[in-house]
Regions:
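Acidic, Gly/Ser/Thr-rich repeat motifs that build Ca2+-stabilized beta-propeller blades
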Residues: 1-6
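Primarily the internal scaffold of c-type cytochrome electron-transfer domains
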Residues: 8-334
Length: 334
């Protein structure tokens, strides 16, 4: 299986090291095509932690309903077969439903299970699920009409399939990879990175959240504003890895373009100005520049202290991330 292949040569070892990775062709290959296209339709919604049901019959599930399989099966050994489940969110569930086994400060497991990432479950408990808006609708938008996938055969396939954009929210990582492609031995070109970065930024700007600012009635010499943030995504905003956060930068300028108030100032050297070292509380009202609205998940260990060590996560100290439209506190996944 796929996961076993990544563990080649680790029998009797203490763990899979970076040195092992650098000598492992499959490890260097990362998440290849077959990691997803070999997933069988077997209780996908109930899986988590990367527990993928990988078939062992060299079947490659895809979106073409009547594929011409001669060339692919002959050249690669994989037989292309139509799989309806490849168009559904359930195929994303296992890798985007993640729980950890809590450890105390001595590294001993406490017996507690902590749900670290619940992106798929957030989608299940949303209006997007009820409206049949799948994960792929945003992250792998469909191509309309036919497309020539190869030189043989040279006719158009009349089926729709998903563009493999797989855009997330991490433009910073993509820029870091682009600028260090030689050191990382990456085959993607700067142009290819730039196109993905552009899609990522466009998704963040137009498909992720919507801001409304309204000035409230106040006394002379005072200003007050109401800021409304609407989550447009089919999961929490932000979602996934706990270190992800979103914050509001609010700037009020005067007639001479002078800054009268600035909350959420950010700089590469100092990060978010005013952010508390331990935990920045959720604010219903901000009256000082050292108060900043940060939407985030903050983990706590067994002693209640903040932690970024995933295995030590025991409690939620803060989770004011914006839920998706239609979420219900009565849903089994809540």
């Amino acid at each position: 299986g796929y996961h076993e292949a990544h563990l080649t040569g680790t029998a009797g070892a203490n763990g899979y090291t970076m040195d092992d990775l650098m000598q492992d062709d499959l490890g260097l290959d990362g998440i290849g095509c077959t990691a997803c296209h070999s997933i069988d339709d077997d209780n996908l919604a109930g899986r988590s932690n990367g527990d993928l049901p990988i078939n062992d019959e060299n079947v490659s599930w895809g979106g073409f309903e009547n594929p011409w399989d001669g060339l692919m099966s002959g050249q690669t050994g994989f037989i292309p077969v139509f799989g309806e489940h490849m168009r559904n969110s359930e195929v994303c569930a296992s890798c985007h439903s993640l729980y950890t086994h809590t450890q105390d400060l001595q590294g001993e497991e406490t017996g507690q299970v902590f749900f670290e990432q619940t992106t798929y479950l957030e989608w299940v408990n949303s209006a997007f699920n009820a409206e049949n808006v799948q994960c792929q609708s945003c992250h792998m938008p469909l191509v309309e009409g036919g497309a020539i996938a190869a030189t043989q055969p040279n006719w158009l396939f009349p089926q729709r399939f998903g563009k493999h954009h797989l855009v997330g929210g991490n433009a910073f990582m993509l820029k870091l990879m682009r600028d260090n492609a030689v050191q990382l031995n990456l085959s993607a070109t700067p142009v290819q990175f730039d196109s993905t970065i552009a899609r990522t930024v466009a998704s963040l700007q137009h498909q992720t959240a919507h801001l409304k600012v309204r000035q409230l009635a106040t006394s002379p010499g005072e200003w007050a504003f109401e800021v409304e943030v609407e989550n447009l995504a089919g999961h929490k905003f932000p979602s996934g890895y706990p270190a992800r956060l979103s914050f509001i930068e609010f700037i009020l300028t005067g007639p001479e373009d002078d800054t009268l108030f600035h909350s959420g100032a950010w700089s590469p050297a100092n990060g978010i100005n005013g952010r508390d070292t331990g935990l920045e509380p959720h604010w219903n009202e901000i009256t000082s520049p050292d108060q900043v609205q940060i939407y985030e998940l903050v983990l706590g260990d067994v002693e209640g202290a903040t932690t970024q060590v995933l295995e030590r996560a025991a409690i939620l100290l803060k989770d004011n991330r914006l839920p998706p439209r239609g979420i219900s506190s009565q849903h089994p996944t809540y």
